[in-house]
């Protein structure tokens, strides 16, 4: 009976994973347009989560009730043997003590699960203490990142951690969905619109440049790939290491398309996602010659692809579909892609003929050199910004960050500890700051109320207080500590973590992040059970 229950719950878990990784990013109701895209995706996520988690919860409750009924007679006999009330009290005390000890041991062994559950508990506590009523539970319209959604994300993590098991096929299906999304977006850049996503919009409309594939605007797209691109790269590296040539080529092409889209989508955050994930990939493969060379070929393909897509858009006259005030137009028109591709190929050739010891020295030198170059770029950028108005930085992200910090400082003790309530950022700051979170008085965003700080940590500080920030940080810290040997998880934590500094939680990134963490937790448990077994289904890359 127990085995049948486990098998059934594994099937439910795999259906849930397929819905989140495959269906959710591709889901689009024709005719709904740009502004209903977020709503439709959230309702799909909420309904699928409630159904799958509800089924699992009912099955578990039935199993617990049956177990209690079976042990009922044994417990009655134990109580009948008690000689007096004192002995019964001692029995209860011993039971509580042993249970407490077991819980402490369990929490130590499952530190990531504990941290995720604490994050969910902080969300519930914040919502219970919130003066903003239903908003704290359901969230703001079009965002829906209230306590209910956070609890569903925690539930998704727990479901995957317990029952995801061997799930490589679903991960590859998720990769297929990811590259399909990228291909639709790249076709849009060339003027093709296979799904009619841009129907009704013309050149000059804000939606014309911001409706990116089936994901929405560039912030949503970058958030999605901050989770899925590390998974895609991990699957590619695994195929290369296992010398599966066909899979390596397919996954290499897939990742190349994703990199091109991230460079053309218009947000600096997307370029950062691609750069951080690729650098992490090169760093993790610094001791692996074949993998390093495969990654150089991937980078070469991305450079050639950028050149071809730029020329294609120029010849078809579709440059107007790129964001006019973003980085995409400069990257698409840059003439140095061919030279950069040649440098990558030359480096790959030199690397190939060197002795193994010199290869490793060269790889380490290039990696540290890239770090020095990145640090120099950051320092140059900071010096360049001196004297400018910080409030205008990042399309007025600077002003949002200032607002968030002012709101936190003005809050009372309850506000500082528990926050205003999940997704109550706009409601709280609208009360304590003159003008609320309205940033623009003209243009497309004139009068728009911003519901987050475009920084997950500052948003969490306002919504869930210091306790929420500590719990959220604990998720990252414990995951990095426990899964530090897992290549995919390291990339996921760094890429998503970096992007979270300039972006926000939404239905296309946060649920997927917790789901992949749950899969890593399941893989860690399988590794403990089968230390000497090389499981083909494992996604871990040492």
Where are these regions (language model features)?
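Short, hydrophobic transmembrane alpha-helix segments
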Residues: 28-42
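N-terminal hydrophobic segments of proteins, predominantly signal-anchor/transmembrane helices
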Residues: 16-32, 53-151, 180
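Aromatic-rich transmembrane-lumenal/periplasmic boundary elements in polytopic membrane proteins
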Residues: 143, 184-200, 377-431
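Membrane-interfacial, low-structure loops and terminal tails that flank and connect transmembrane helices
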Residues: 2-6, 67-110, 243-246, 320-324, ...
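Interfacial juxtamembrane loops and adjacent helix segments
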Residues: 194-212, 414-462
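Membrane-interface helix caps and helix-loop-helix hairpins in membrane proteins
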Residues: 135-140, 263-266, 501-508
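Membrane-interface coil-to-helix junctions
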Residues: 40-43, 47, 111, 119, ...
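Alpha-helical transmembrane segments of multi-pass inner-membrane proteins
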Residues: 4-25, 49-60, 120-128, 146-158, ...
